A protein has these predicted regions:
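Active-site-adjacent betaalpha module
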Residues: 127-128
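Short glycine/serine/threonine-rich phosphate/pyrophosphate-binding segments
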Residues: 124
Length: 175
């Protein structure tokens, strides 16, 4: 068995946010060589996410996003089949897809983090749904974490670094 490759992704700035902690963390965190990185533009673009999976060929995909209102790390457990910007009409991500898809990667939580079953309907949720739908008939695992906008970068790096390390050490994710 070989150790799994991981794709860690985050996002660049959006709307009035000049920075995005998720993209900053993906760029700055020290990671093993079998972890690929992507920082995506904040846009509803299915092909952008699928192309990255095809390019990197990971067994595990960990997404990071920024939460402007949260004070704790949120471990997202499901993506809903809705997309849209705040104040605009929502529409389905996948015309014939299920109402929601569960994340297949178990992410441990502690006092720094809480479980969440509502990732909203913006691009983080969109990426989660598209990736989970793409991976559901494969052995790939995917998970998503929202980081508070004003969270301490050292603590965020420690949390994500520990998650990557635990994921790599867990035989449940080896292919």
């Amino acid at each position: 068995m070989k150790m799994p490759g991981i794709l860690l992704y985050g996002f660049g700035p959006y709307d009035s946010h000049e920075t995005n902690i998720s993209g900053e963390l993906v760029r700055s965190i020290q990671l093993p060589r079998n972890v690929s990185r992507e920082v995506f533009d904040v846009k509803f673009d299915r092909a952008m996410f699928i192309d990255a999976i095809r390019r990197h060929g990971p067994a595990i995909i960990i997404g990071l996003g920024q939460s402007a209102r949260s004070r704790k790390i949120r471990i997202e457990r499901r993506a809903v089949n809705l997309m849209g910007e705040r104040g605009k009409k929502k529409r389905p991500i996948s015309r014939h897809g299920p109402d929601h898809l569960s994340m297949s990667l178990d992410v441990p939580h502690d006092d720094q983090a809480r479980l969440s079953y509502d990732a909203g309907t913006y691009v983080c949720n969109f990426s989660m749904y598209v990736i989970a739908e793409h991976c559901r008939d494969s052995r790939r695992r995917c998970g998503f974490i929202h980081l508070p906008k004003r969270y301490d970068m050292r603590h965020a790096e420690a949390f994500v670094g520990k998650l990557v390390e635990q994921t790599l050490l867990s035989r449940n994710h080896w292919v």
